[in-house]
């Protein structure tokens, strides 16, 4: 047994000299490629990310609200109050939106008319009686023309009532019915005054509405 161990010890140094440990040597090209594939350091990545986020903040991107603001809901009373305020009409400030009118424009002047149209329709209704009244009232669209036709027709009615009452060509036409004569006479007089008075009021409208907001006027004949 001792001889076997001595022989093994003598053989082992001789075998060890035949082997050499190879070092891990790499070629220069592979070493450069490995250095190029290495990831960048963490500090450079953090600096680039901070610069990117600073750029986004400077460009005007909206920041999200905080958690408290995003999760805070209004109470029931506040919600009802906001709803009630939204439904209230802004009536007190409405008059400030209107602009006063310096004068009537051409369209308003055509609706009112002038004295010439009033006199023309007045004489048409007075001379041609009901035919002149219908023609002048239907062919004119201005207030002066229609009020002139009404006034002229009223005076024409008075004229014919007086002719029939005191003429010898119509004897006994109103015998026993004098109340009917008074009814037509008063009716003609009221129509005559109505046309003149209403036209006088219409003529003053440009002065009345010159300092008021734009108003739509409805004429009732």
Swiss-Prot record:
Keyword annotations from UniProtKB, A to Z:
Acetylation, Cell projection, Endosome, Golgi apparatus, Membrane, Repeat, Secreted, Synapse, Synaptosome, Transmembrane, Transmembrane helix, Ubl conjugation
Record localization:
Endosome membrane; Golgi apparatus membrane; Synapse, Synaptosome; Cell projection, Dendrite
Which GO terms of type biological process are on file? CD4-positive, alpha-beta T cell proliferation; intracellular iron ion homeostasis; metal ion transport; negative regulation of CD4-positive, alpha-beta T cell proliferation; negative regulation of gene expression; negative regulation of inflammatory response; negative regulation of interleukin-4 production; negative regulation of isotype switching to IgE isotypes
Topology Cytoplasmic: residue spans: 2-116, 165-172
**GO cellular component entries:** cell cortex; dendrite; endoplasmic reticulum; endosome membrane; extracellular region; Golgi apparatus; Golgi membrane; perinuclear region of cytoplasm
Q: Where is this region: Interaction with ITCH?
A: 42-76
- Motif PPxY motif 3: residue span? 74-76
What happens to this protein after translation, modification-wise?
Answer: Ubiquitinated by NEDD4; mono-, di- and polyubiquitinated forms are detected. Ubiquitination regulates its degradation.
Per the record's keyword annotation, is Transmembrane included, yes or no? Answer: yes
Which stretch carries the motif PPxY motif 2? 64-67
In which residues does the motif PPxY motif 1 occur? Answer: 39-42
Report the GO molecular function annotations.
WW domain binding
Tell me where in this chain the PTM N-acetylalanine is found: 2
Q: Residue ranges, Extracellular compartment?
A: 138-143, 194-221
Where does the chain cross the membrane? 117-137, 144-164, 173-193
Segment Disordered: which positions? 15-45
Query: Where is this chain primarily localised?
Result: membrane
List every stretch annotated Interaction with UBE2L3.
2-41
Q: What membrane topology is given?
A: Multi-pass membrane protein
Q: Partners and quaternary state? A: Forms heterodimers with NDFIP2. Interacts with several E3 ubiquitin-protein ligases, including ITCH, NEDD4, NEDD4L and WWP2. The interaction with NEDD4, NEDD4L and ITCH leads to relocalization of these proteins to exosomes and eventually to exosomal secretion. Interacts with SR1402. Interacts with SLC11A2/DMT1. Interacts with PTEN. May interact with phosphorylated EGFR. Interacts with BRAT1. Interacts with KCNH2. Interacts with MAVS. Part of a complex containing ITCH, NDFIP1 and MAP3K7. Interacts (via N-terminus) with UBE2L3; the interaction mediates recruitment of UBE2L3 to ITCH.
**Function in brief:** Activates HECT domain-containing E3 ubiquitin-protein ligases, including NEDD4 and ITCH, and consequently modulates the stability of their targets. As a result, controls many cellular processes. Prevents chronic T-helper cell-mediated inflammation by activating ITCH and thus controlling JUNB degradation. Promotes pancreatic beta cell death through degradation of JUNB and inhibition of the unfolded protein response, leading to reduction of insulin secretion.
Q: What domain notes does the record hold?
A: The PPxY motifs are required for E3 ubiquitin-protein ligase binding and activation and for ubiquitination.
Its protein name is NEDD4 family-interacting protein 1
Q: Which organism is it from?
A: Rattus norvegicus
Name the encoding gene, please.
Ndfip1
């Amino acid at each position: 047994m001792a001889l076997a161990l001595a022989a093994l010890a003598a053989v082992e140094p001789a075998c060890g000299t035949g082997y050499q440990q190879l070092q891990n040597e790499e070629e220069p090209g592979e070493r450069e490629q490995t250095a190029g594939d290495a990831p960048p350091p963490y500090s450079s990545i953090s600096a680039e990310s901070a610069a990117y986020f600073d750029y986004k903040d400077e460009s005007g991107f909206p920041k999200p609200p905080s958690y408290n603001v995003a999760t805070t809901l209004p109470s029931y009373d506040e919600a009802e109050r906001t709803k009630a305020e939204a439904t209230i009409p802004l009536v007190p400030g409405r008059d400030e939106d209107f602009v006063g009118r310096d004068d009537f424009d051409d369209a308003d002047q055509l609706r009112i008319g002038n004295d010439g149209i009033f006199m023309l329709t007045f004489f048409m209704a007075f001379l041609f009686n009901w035919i002149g009244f219908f023609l002048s009232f239907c062919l004119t669209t201005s207030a002066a023309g229609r009020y002139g036709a009404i006034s002229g027709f009223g005076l024409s009615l008075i004229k014919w009532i007086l002719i029939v009452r005191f003429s010898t060509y119509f004897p006994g036409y109103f015998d026993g019915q004098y109340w009917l004569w008074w009814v037509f006479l008063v009716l003609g007089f009221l129509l005559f005054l109505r046309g003149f008075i209403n036209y006088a009021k219409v003529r003053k409208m440009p002065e009345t509405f010159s300092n008021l907001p734009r108003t739509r006027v409805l004429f009732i004949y």
